[in-house]
């Protein structure tokens, strides 16, 4: 009994596949006939935003992607950066936004699984994960359910697979009510001379399917990820993939073992658009055709059509081009790990993508036009309007500074994330040196006495909305600053660019300006972008998310014994601020959460100052002079000091002294390129003299000691009172306790 592959191609079917009339006409011109149903599915998957980057490619090319340590930049499964001693770090961040809104547990879990596969496909063993999460406003009826499901999914997969979650972000805003963001990051370590790529080489070589069996889960997932949501969202539940972290753990071990044998010519994980995308990418990159025999694909459901097999996004699967003489050795490894191993095709020299099913050719398409020569758009865009200046004297000061600070540290967006990260295994593998809650996660490099890597993920969407160019710069600068605050040298970054509908010129303008800002900051800070992901159409019923270009970065610590933490100050240490006095209250959390206003421009990022101040701070830490360090970001100096007090369990006596400007601007201003350092009292004068000599602005703030944070006569808060406010919001919210949760 044959399975039908013939379905009439109607305008409704074409539109349902996300193809515009002009794109369908391009298909007709390209192949000179009507496509089969399977071919329509293949074009739909390969020409959508998720796989082709057709709206963003033009602008992504402007980003700096090279540097002395960059081994592999964008275009592969993940970026690769040299960390000395013949080792490299392999990392990437990507989104699983649309599936996680529809089915939060599986959407988030398979997001983690997908990014881990991207890393070990390259030959690297994963050593760290992070996730940047954005949810709707806390009192939206779906938010608590989504937070619970996503956090369980991230933890369930990462913990079972065995990778520590070392950092991330969780934020709430009404603009994410209809589209949450789940951006997952993973990093692994490999030998620099043993990196595996996806470019197929050689004609007539076997194309091998590895891993789990193919089912109907995730069919059309990539197409869904390239569309806006509307009222029919619940119908999309079947397009969410289902993950199994134990199978993935076996796949990791089998792949790394196979890579030792010299059998692998090219390897690609099956992610978006499954078998279609992995086969096309391998062939197109190597200027080769691919012939697939679907009757040989391992399936776990009956009567699957060619269309379903080609577009299934079942998890834990790989595609590989193999040295033919190593076939039996390779197969034995996968059988040992309980995984499928099937030769499902071969490479050809005709640049065609041909798919056979039940003896019939169901697809015969030009492979380059599906892959690296897919359509590309130069969409119309316009710049965002500038926000009017907002001098500090036009912003009301709080009646009670202590109360304002308690309100900030206990707010939805500034409170402790302990409830979240305690559900993640942060210590597995035994190399974690800094856990979530500080500036960056730090993980020791196995087999090396002193080397470690620092990881951070950052973006301030309210800044990007107010000024996409400065907001793009700030996301890069804050990531660079967080890594620097541990004493690490920032090496390279990965971007995850989440925006609304690019067909709207104002949204496309946000994207273009943010990418320009990211590029400028990366060039100024020698912080190249080596991998990334773009997620567009994050809109529901015409309401777009806040523009959210997440930047995740990696830094190198040659000696982790000289690393700085935010909570390691000693009694009697002196507190010194590096950078200018706070003055900028536009778009600050003080303005938003205390005064309920969202006005003013985003803070400007002076990249020269960012570099100068950061390099100075790093040298202080590496010279062993700093006992603690924390960067100043959302909430300004006051929140940074409060976080240090809570982390160290030691009070601070602060005197703003000669600070120029209004106290609320000094305390809550969100000016950039700033850090708080604590140093032994006998080092303070020396450090200040060095800062002066290097042209680095600084201010002596006070002394470590006592059991309270005091700032002149403005603030006097016992550590426990700060901690109670900081730690209570999240558990209260998740347990639905009273008014607190609805604030």
UniProtKB/Swiss-Prot annotation:
Q: Which domain of life is it from?
A: Bacteria
The gene name reads purL
Cellular localisation: Cytoplasm
Positions of substrate binding = 95-98, 117, 241, 313-315, 535
Q: What is this protein called?
A: Phosphoribosylformylglycinamidine synthase subunit PurL
Q: Which HAMAP family match?
A: PurL_2 (MF_00420)
UniProt subunit comment: Monomer. Part of the FGAM synthase complex composed of 1 PurL, 1 PurQ and 2 PurS subunits.
Q: Where is the active site?
A: 50, 96 (proton acceptor)
Where does this protein come from, organism-wise?
Rhizobium leguminosarum bv. trifolii (strain WSM2304)
Q: Which residues bind Mg(2+) 2?
A: 118, 269
EC number from the UniProt entry: 6.3.5.3
